[in-house]
């Protein structure tokens, strides 16, 4: 257990006094009190749920100052000092005496836990200084102490003050607005789209939650999440549409194309006229009931931020069709931002006879969300839309080709074999859930869906005009907002190439960019114990949306990475891709810095039918056995080459390049590679451990979240680091098809998904080479075999030692 805080702002003593006064921890005259007296007042105020003097005395009597005295007894006879302050402080932070720390020596535990402390406390000002910092310190639940006090009702004293602006403490907005009095309403933004071609601009349903004080004139910024999922999905119908993956890859017609041959150009279309605005009102006519929300958004609702959700075109109660990642979905998100910024019209109902402005908005917007949600945030940012001040995009797609394809191959997102753009469009076309609406829209949508099925081209797997229209990287130069990117280093759903390419493209754009890489798969991280992610984003949004001068841009690391070998360890870096490449040659069964005699290595792609069927139904078993050093069922179906045991820990940082001289027995084929960490070790679990179910309160009598953390699991012999796949007819790029003659050797270069991986001392680095990937590629079980000539076959590894 260790805590990593990056959002703790160091401020001068005078500012600490002012801020403690602002949140009522200091009252008039307190600054003249003796150190013991002011310390006791601080303690009493730290128990807002104990209302009377007797109740507070009881609470304080349960805090041990020493092995023999509680804090009340101690203060009656002794002066507060640093040891006692932090012995009590650790208890306030939720740590247990004897289990987590020693009352006689709290400092050793604080060093181990990576918690800040003040070495000396003698005078009143020392107490004030230390108390301010303690309020900002991580508790055992990962939240700071002030958040824990807020959850107990500390800030309810501000509810009746009719505040017209937030209160900030240590650069972060505090929960001074009553979540029991939030205003919930619905509007319909008129978009710049007519995706269903009914002669009317598509109206987009927007769900709003805002503080009650906005009705009294308070202007607030908005946290906007564009979520095609939030009003439900068509799981059953999408499942029926899933494409079969029981197909071999086929030879492709040789086509030497240039990028210009497949480049997307926006067609000239004439939009229907805007609806006339006859009446304008401030009063919404609809509210909303239940929807799936993002817990970070929930957390910010008490802190002076509005939260908005919109599904976009084709979702329940909106107009139009789902288009899976193209410009229509981008513009749908952009248009909501424009309404929040005062530059677009919305209506109170689908009848569209009363316009309603975002009169409560200060015009500033941040977008949040993971996966498709983060993708739409990225997409909206590439429009350069005014009012979008920042995005916090998590596990976001930057090019849809890199989600559903790779290297001229149809590739399934991890866990979803057979899914494609058309399936996702159907999945998210939640207009289908409204029978009356669906009756009018289903024929047109099904016809539109058939064009997606055709244009996505599952036959060749090549990059084409369809995918070029869904490549946000082309428009990164338009981005004007600052960006926080978050991604899992073990995410095989939205693969790391997406954030890696976006991060690199942003290098030429004059915006602030921050990158956080965690050890998770496709997850949120705002409920981690070891990282103050929520505080970091609160600091960031307080700066970006309220203009608070809190050094957020300087405090948050440019690149923050969770270590893969240790629990609760986060490290800062200045770059992702290593500039240094180490060359290791392929030999008969090894990787080495020395080139040995030339050999030809061979593997087959075909499996016995019973084995093939077994792996189709147990992909997890295949994923284990393809990497295992001894695996009788796959012995001839892959090559495993390993380095010597490492003499010291090595960091793999960025993409690796695998150069192979390879021949296919047939006139078509594919090659797949994995880099593997071989060595017995306890490794972080694949998913975070739930430390306490619903253990995180997100406010006072408000919503909850699970408290989680990655923990070292049982010992395993290996772990996949990264992988890549390539169609041998796409040796030069993803859009141009090359010739491939049977049994002829060709030089290919395979670029892996990017890495940030510590390879421990004594472990071996392994390269696994095979063809069909039972988790990701098509699975035809074809009678094909491959040969690799070790002449000219080697790895270029991005190693930093």
UniProtKB/Swiss-Prot annotation:
Report whether Transferase shows up as a keyword of the record. Answer: no
Where along the chain is the active site annotated? 371, 491, 522
Q: Which gene encodes it?
A: pepX
The catalysed reaction is: Hydrolyzes Xaa-Pro-|- bonds to release unblocked, N-terminal dipeptides from substrates including Ala-Pro-|-p-nitroanilide and (sequentially) Tyr-Pro-|-Phe-Pro-|-Gly-Pro-|-Ile
Q: Subunit info?
A: Homodimer.
Which cellular component terms (GO) are annotated to the entry? cytoplasm
List the protein's name: Xaa-Pro dipeptidyl-peptidase
- Could you read off the lineage of the organism from its UniProt record? Bacteria, Bacillati, Bacillota, Bacilli, Lactobacillales
Query: What class does this enzyme belong to in the EC scheme?
Result: hydrolase
User: Which Gene Ontology BP terms does the record give?
Assistant: proteolysis
Q: Which GO terms describe its molecular function?
A: aminopeptidase activity; dipeptidyl-peptidase activity; serine-type peptidase activity
Q: Return the Pfam families for the record.
A: Peptidase_S15, PepX_C, PepX_N
């Amino acid at each position: 257990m260790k805590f990593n805080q990056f959002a703790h702002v160091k401020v001068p003593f005078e500012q600490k006094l002012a801020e403690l006064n602002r949140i009522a921890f200091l009252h008039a005259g307190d600054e003249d009190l003796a150190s013991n007296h002011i310390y006791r007042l601080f303690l009493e105020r730290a128990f807002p749920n104990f209302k009377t003097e007797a109740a507070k005395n009881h609470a304080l009597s349960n805090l041990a100052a020493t092995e023999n005295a509680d804090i009340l007894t101690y203060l009656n006879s002794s002066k507060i000092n640093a040891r006692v302050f932090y012995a009590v402080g650790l208890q306030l932070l939720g740590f247990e005496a004897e289990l987590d720390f020693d009352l006689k020596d709290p400092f050793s535990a604080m060093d181990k836990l990576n918690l800040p402390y003040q070495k000396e406390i003698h005078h009143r000002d020392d107490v004030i200084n230390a108390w301010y910092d303690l309020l900002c310190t991580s508790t055992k639940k990962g939240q700071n102490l002030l958040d824990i006090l807020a959850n107990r009702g500390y800030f309810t004293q501000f509810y009746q003050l009719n505040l017209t602006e937030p209160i900030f403490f240590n650069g972060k907005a505090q929960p001074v607005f009553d979540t029991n009095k939030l205003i919930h309403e619905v509007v319909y933004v008129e978009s710049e789209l007519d995706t269903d071609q009914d002669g009317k601009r598509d109206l987009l349903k927007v769900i709003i939650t805002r503080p009650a004080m906005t009705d009294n004139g308070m202007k607030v910024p908005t946290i906007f999440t564009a979520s095609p999922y939030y009003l439900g999905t068509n799981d059953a119908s999408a499942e029926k549409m899933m494409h079969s993956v029981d197909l071999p890859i086929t030879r492709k017609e040789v086509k030497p194309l240039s990028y210009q041959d497949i480049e997307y150009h926006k067609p000239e279309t004439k939009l229907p006229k805007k609806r006339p605005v006859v009446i304008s009102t401030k009063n919404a006519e609809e509210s909303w009931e239940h929807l799936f929300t993002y817990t970070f958004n929930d957390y910010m609702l008490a802190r002076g931020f509005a939260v908005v959700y919109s599904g976009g075109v084709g979702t329940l109660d909106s107009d139009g069709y789902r288009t899976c990642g193209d410009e229509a979905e981008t513009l749908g998100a952009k248009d909501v931002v424009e309404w929040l910024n005062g530059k677009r019209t919305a209506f109170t109902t689908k009848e569209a006879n009363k316009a309603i402005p975002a009169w409560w908005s200060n015009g500033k917007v941040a977008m949040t969300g993971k996966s498709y949600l983060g993708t739409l945030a990225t997409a909206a940012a590439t429009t350069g839309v005014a009012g979008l001040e920042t995005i916090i995009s998590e596990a976001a797609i930057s090019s849809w080709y890199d989600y559903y394809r790779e290297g001229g191959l149809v590739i399934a997102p991890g866990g979803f074999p057979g899914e494609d753009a058309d399936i996702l469009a159907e999945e998210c076309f939640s207009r289908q859930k409204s029978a009356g609406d669906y009756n009018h829209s289903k024929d047109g949508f099904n016809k539109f869906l058939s064009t997606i099925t055709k244009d996505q081209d599952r036959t060749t797997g090549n990059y084409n005009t369809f995918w070029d229209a869904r490549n946000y990287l082309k428009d990164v130069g338009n981005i004007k907002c600052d960006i926080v990117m978050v991604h899992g280093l073990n995410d095989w759903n939205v693969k790391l190439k997406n954030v890696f390419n976006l991060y690199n493209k942003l290098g030429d754009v004059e915006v602030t960019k921050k990158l956080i890489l965690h050890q998770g798969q496709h997850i949120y991280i705002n409920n981690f114990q070891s990282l103050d992610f929520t505080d970091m984003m609160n600091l960031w949004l307080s700066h970006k949306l309220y203009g608070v001068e809190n050094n957020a841009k300087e405090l948050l690391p440019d690149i923050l990475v969770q270590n893969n070998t240790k629990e609760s360890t986060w490290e800062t870096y200045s770059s992702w891709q290593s500039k240094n490449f180490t060359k290791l040659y392929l030999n008969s069964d090894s990787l080495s810095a020395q080139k040995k005699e030339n050999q030809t290595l061979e593997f087959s792609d075909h499996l016995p039918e019973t084995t093939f069927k077994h792996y189709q139904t147990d992909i997890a078993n295949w994923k284990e056995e393809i990497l295992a050093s001894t695996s009788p069922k796959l012995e001839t179906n892959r090559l495993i080459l390993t380095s010597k045991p490492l003499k010291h820990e090595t960091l793999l940082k960025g993409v690796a390049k695998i150069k192979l001289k390879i021949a296919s027995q047939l006139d078509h084929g594919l090659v797949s590679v994995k880099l593997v960490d071989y060595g017995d070790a306890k490794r972080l679990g694949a998913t975070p451990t739930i430390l306490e179910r619903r253990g995180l309160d997100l406010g006072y009598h408000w919503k909850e979240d699970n408290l989680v953390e990655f923990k070292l699991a049982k010992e395993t012999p290996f772990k996949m680091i990264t992988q890549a796949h390539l169609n041998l007819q796409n040796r030069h790029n993803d859009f141009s098809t090359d010739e491939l003659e049977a049994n002829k050797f060709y030089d290919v270069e395979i670029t892996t998904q990017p890495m940030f991986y510590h390879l421990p001392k004594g472990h071996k680095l392994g390269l696994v080479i095979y063809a069909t990937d039972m988790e990701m590629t098509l699975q035809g079980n074809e009678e094909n075999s491959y040969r690799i000539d070790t002449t000219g076959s080697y790895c270029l590894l991005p190693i930093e030692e």
